[in-house]
């Protein structure tokens, strides 16, 4: 029987192993022993990020772009391999082509987080010592920041968990590292929201830092009802790890997350004397921009422009966009109900409409247009405004 007809592969088959050993040349085929010579650099020279990340994860020979050969010597019960192409609908000639534009790996990522915390600590010390909390409107502080901004941490926590499958099933190390960091940044945002609430509890007598009230709003309230359903779907109901990662960042968070963070809390906070919440939101927006660059490289530059599967991948991503756009619009429509709880005169329909157009236009330019998804900005805004009371 020919080697192609054998069911067993590589080292699991002694006969095939003997054939392989016999075919090995006596002298090395390649005498280059420079570190990482087998990695194709994205930039002018091989970066530290690439040298320590690319091809660190072993791969079977059916994972496109890898350097290994043969099958796994160990498998899950039932014969499932450690990684398999069946975990995603997207296809490519090279799963190892993606690069994080910011070249993040473990050490610089941890360093960045440490620097952010030190800066946050200094800011909070100055804020407290200066008594700036006295300028914040108590209703805004106790109702909108405590309850509704606090409830948003569960949105970010759910999106963090939506990355768990991709962090396990990703078919290459470069993809896995990016997915993991996108997820960690989401849980970091959730922690920053609770940090703000904990800080307020220290400087405002009677302010409750417990998550009981925000959790009740997230699980039982009307403002986040459709958002909760969307997050639960992205986290628990998607088999394809690329679908969940793509839909979180290229659809849901780019629309709903951006509106909540930037166009509601960050835009309105100064009107209530709140310069504390925008400090944390600016960090969250930095994470959003970092993830956007990585998402665009992975899904548009690599998979969307794949030399063999570009048309197919774009079709799949357009289908995912259409699938998750409706739940996202529903989440925004429900969130419109929060404007009715604001004091009269805080904002008006004209400003809210302009905010929606900013978010939708950014989404179309940065995401939808990159895969030729036809989106009607006016129709989206109209559908969302139907929830404005």
UniProtKB/Swiss-Prot annotation:
Pfam families: Phenol_Hydrox. It is an enzyme of class 1 (oxidoreductase). It catalyses: methane + NADH + O2 + H(+) = methanol + NAD(+) + H2O; methane + NADPH + O2 + H(+) = methanol + NADP(+) + H2O. GO terms for molecular function: methane monooxygenase [NAD(P)H] activity. It comes from the Bacteria. Its EC number is 1.14.13.25. CDD domains: AAMH_B (cd01058). Responsible for the initial oxygenation of methane to methanol in methanotrophs. It also catalyzes the monohydroxylation of a variety of unactivated alkenes, alicyclic, aromatic and heterocyclic compounds. M.capsulatus has two forms of methane monooxygenase, a soluble and a membrane-bound type. The soluble type consists of four components (A to D): protein A, comprising three chains, in an alpha-2, beta-2, gamma-2 configuration, is a nonheme iron protein containing an unusual mu-hydroxo bridge structure at its active site and interacts with both oxygen and methane. This is Methane monooxygenase component A beta chain. It comes from Methylococcus capsulatus (strain ATCC 33009 / NCIMB 11132 / Bath). The gene is mmoY.
